[in-house]
UniProtKB/Swiss-Prot annotation:
Gene name of the encoded protein: ilvD
Name under which the protein is recorded: Dihydroxy-acid dehydratase
Xref: SUPFAM superfamilies: IlvD/EDD N-terminal domain-like, LeuD/IlvD-like
Pathway(s) where this gene product acts: Amino-acid biosynthesis; L-isoleucine biosynthesis; L-isoleucine from 2-oxobutanoate: step 3/4; Amino-acid biosynthesis; L-valine biosynthesis; L-valine from pyruvate: step 3/4
GO cellular component, one term: cytosol
Source organism of this protein record: Shewanella woodyi (strain ATCC 51908 / MS32)
Record note on cofactor: Binds 1 [2Fe-2S] cluster per subunit. This cluster acts as a Lewis acid cofactor.
Top-rank EC class of the record's enzyme: lyase
Modified residues (N6-carboxylysine): 124
EC number of this enzyme: 4.2.1.9
Active-site residues from the entry: 517
Family, per entry: Belongs to the IlvD/Edd family.
Residues binding Mg(2+): 81, 123-124, 491
Amino acid sequence: MPKLRSATSTQGRNMAGARALWRATGVKDSDFGKPIIAISNSFTQFVPGHVHLKDMGSLVAGAIEEAGGIAKEFNTIAVDDGIAMGHGGMLYSLPSRELIADSVEYMVNAHCADALVCISNCDKITPGMMMAALRLNIPVIFVSGGPMEAGKTKLSGDIIKLDLVDAMVAGADERVSDEDSEKIERSACPTCGSCSGMFTANSMNCLTEALGLSLPGNGSMLATHADRRELFLEAGRRIMDLATRYYKHDDESALPRNIANFNAFENAMTLDIAMGGSSNTVLHLLAGAQEAKVDFTMDDIDRLSRKVPHLCKVAPSTPKYHMEDVHRAGGVMGILGELDRAGLIHNDAYHVAGKNLKEVLAKWDIAQSQDEAVRKFFSAGPAGIPTTKAFSQDCRWDSVDDDREGGCIRKREFAFSQEGGLAVLSGNIALDGCIVKTAGVEEENHTFIGSARVYESQDDAVAGILGGEVVAGDVVVIRYEGPKGGPGMQEMLYPTSYLKSRGLGKACALITDGRFSGGTSGLSIGHVSPEAAAGGTIGLVETGDRIEIDIPARSIKLAISDVELAARRSAMESRGKQAWKPVDRIREVSLALKAYALLATSADKGAVRDVSKLED
C-alpha cells in the first residue's frame, strides 16, 4: 500500500520543525496522518475567466475537510490572451504554460502533497496544470471556472449573439460606425467566465472531461449559473475518493497517467475534431502526452482527423451557437455519446466521474439517460445580466436541445460535415506538419492556390494588411513567430481579424509558424513545423512564390523545384550566425523569453522545452 507522500513532512521526531510550521497554518494534532490535498487556484483580477475564482478554493477546501482531508490552497499566474493580444505581451502567453506547470510541480513536491485539485479556466492555465498533474502522477481532478454568457445586442433591428472576436473585427472595420462598434464592444463580453465560443479555454476545459480528469459539465456549465457551485463541491469530495482508492487500497486506476492513457488521449482528440475545437489544443494535448509518457503524436491526430465527423459547430465557426447552447444540448457528454454510438471512442477508459466512460455516459448523455436531474442540469441557461460574480443566477431553458438532426449537437449521419473540424496538412513547406481548423473554413476554400506575401513578424503583417499591401488571392506568410523564433509562438488573431475587416477573409489564406487564437476562422494554417528559426522551409519562401493548399488531400506545397529550394537553403546557411533569423526585425526580447527560446521545440512536439539541448 503506498505511503502518504505527506508523511515525509508530518511523521517522525526529526520532522518536529515541519510540524511546527504546519501547526502555524492551522493543522491540528488530529489532522496529522490525513491526506494533504493541494488546491491549485488561478484567481486573478486581470482575467474575466478567473476574476470570480477567489472563493472557489474555499468551497473545494470545505468539501475536502468534510470528507476527512487537509486542504491547502496556493495560486498560479494566469495570462489573458485577449488582453495580451496584438502587442509584445503575446510573447509571454505560451511560455506561461511552462511556468504554470513548473509552479504547480514546485508547490506540490516541495510540500509533499498527496493529491491535487486544479481550479483553472483560460487558455494556458488548464494546459499548464494538466502538464503538471501528469508529470506529478498523484490523484488529481480538474474543475474550471466555466464559460461566460454570450454577448447579445440589437443591430439593424435584430438581436445577435456576440463574442470577443466580433468586437475586434468591428473595431478594425471602417464600414462599421463608431456607434455600432462601441455597442458591440460593450456587449461582447458581458460576464465573468472564459470567452463564450469554442475558443482555446473552453476547448481545453471540454477536453478534460474526455480525458477523464473532470466532472460532466465542467466544460459547458456557465460560470454565472448556480448549478456550477456543485461542481466545485463534488470535486472536493471526488479527490478524497481518488486519494483513498490509491493510498488505502493501492488502486492505481485512480492515478492520472492511468486515466489519461493513450486511449483517453485518442478520446480527447476525437472530441476536439468533432466539436471543431481550437487548434491550440493540438499543442497542449501533445505536450500533455509527453508528460504522461504516452506516445501520442501528430500522426495519430492526422489519422483521427480523417475519420471523425464534425458533430458540433460553435462560434467562431458559426454565430448561431455558443457554449451556453452546447450545454443545453447535453454538453461534452452529449457529443461523446454520439461519438460512442458511432464507434469512434474508447468507452472503457477510466474516468473520475465513474468506473469508466461507458458508465458515465449512461447517466450523463441526455440521449440515453433517464435521469430527470441530468436533464435539469443541462437546462441551465444564461440570465443576460452583466456580472463578475459566480453562481449569480439560476435561469433555465424551457427544454434541453436533444434535436440530433438539426440542433447544436448532431448524430453522425446528420453531421455538419463528415470531415472533422481540425486537419493536419504536410508538404515541403511543413515537413513535420501544420494545423488548420477546418470547422472555420468555407468549403470553397478547401483548395486554394495563391501568391505568397511574406512578412517576418506579426507586426509587419498587420501593417501590410491595414496598409493595403495584401490583395485577394494572396497567401499571407508570417514567419519567425514560432516557439523559438518569436519567441513564444504568438497568436495571429489580429491579422485574421483584419483580413475579415478588409473583406479578405474568404479571399486570402494565412500560414504561419505561429499559432491562432481559438477565435480564429477562415483559411488560417498554423503550427508550421519545423518553424523558420529551426530551419523550416517556411523560412525560405519568397514573396510571389506560388503556394498550393489542398485540405481534402491534406497537403500544403511551395511550388518551386527541389533544385531551387536547395539553392535557397544553401544561401540561407551561408549567412552564418544570421541564418534562420528575421531580417531587420526590431523586437525587445527579455532574459526570461531568451531562456525559453533556448529550449523550445517546434509545434509538432507541443512546443515543450527540450532539456537535452543543454547537453548538446
